[in-house]
From Swiss-Prot:
UniProt entry keywords in alphabetical sequence: Hydrolase, Magnesium, Metal-binding
Catalytic residue list: D9, D11
Name of the molecule in the record: Putative 5'(3')-deoxyribonucleotidase
Keyword field contains Metal-binding: yes
Length: 179
């Protein structure tokens, strides 16, 4: 029997990219942005005068290599990997300098995944999977399988997709559909 496929986004789903960006922006621009203040907003809209700084941070060698893993992501992805084919689909084209760091990060924190299942892409409509777990509504709306929105500060007002709020919710979602 063929196993179903789950494609999982990296930034803001497996990795706490926003937390690292906010920390770096606060330090370099002498700001005091709190994560709670971002609910329903994108960082670039809150501080348009620092959009260049944000892009500089994202382009720095090592930035994506040093991100924190989202709570419970490793254990849940490992469990899902026992029953599903797991693919990591990260929209790396926005920051092409991130490829190597993202690859090394995935090898370190998700060593049980097949590196041949790491997909560095732009638009995720190219991904042939049964499920996509992503925080970006634009990626979810073009995906042809079942779209699952992973809660992030910028998408809290989005209601078009089934939602999971953290990796324990992901585990519960897939446990509820297993036969």
């Amino acid at each position: 029997m063929t196993r179903q496929r789950i494609a999982i986004d990296m930034d803001e789903v497996l990795a706490d990219t926003l937390g690292a960006v906010v920390k770096a922006v606060n330090e370099r621009a002498d700001l005091n942005i709190k994560m709670e203040s971002l609910n329903g907003k994108k960082l670039k809209h809150m501080i348009p005068e620092h959009e260049g700084l944000v892009m500089d941070i994202l382009k720095e060698p090592g930035f994506f290599r040093n991100l924190d893993v989202m709570p419970h992501a490793q254990e849940v992805v490992k469990q899902l990997n026992e029953h599903y084919d797991i693919y990591i689909a990260t929209a790396a084209m926005d920051v092409p300098t991130s490829f190597h760091d993202k690859y090394e990060w995935l090898l370190e924190y998700f060593p049980f995944l097949d590196p041949q299942h790491f997909v560095f892409c732009g638009r995720k409509n190219i991904i042939l999977a049964d499920y996509l777990i992503d925080d970006n509504p634009k990626q979810l709306e073009i995906f042809e399988g079942k779209s699952i929105m992973f809660t992030a500060s910028h998408n809290v007002n989005e209601h078009r997709f089934e939602r999971v709020s953290g990796w324990r919710d992901v585990k519960n979602y897939f446990n509820s559909i297993e036969k």
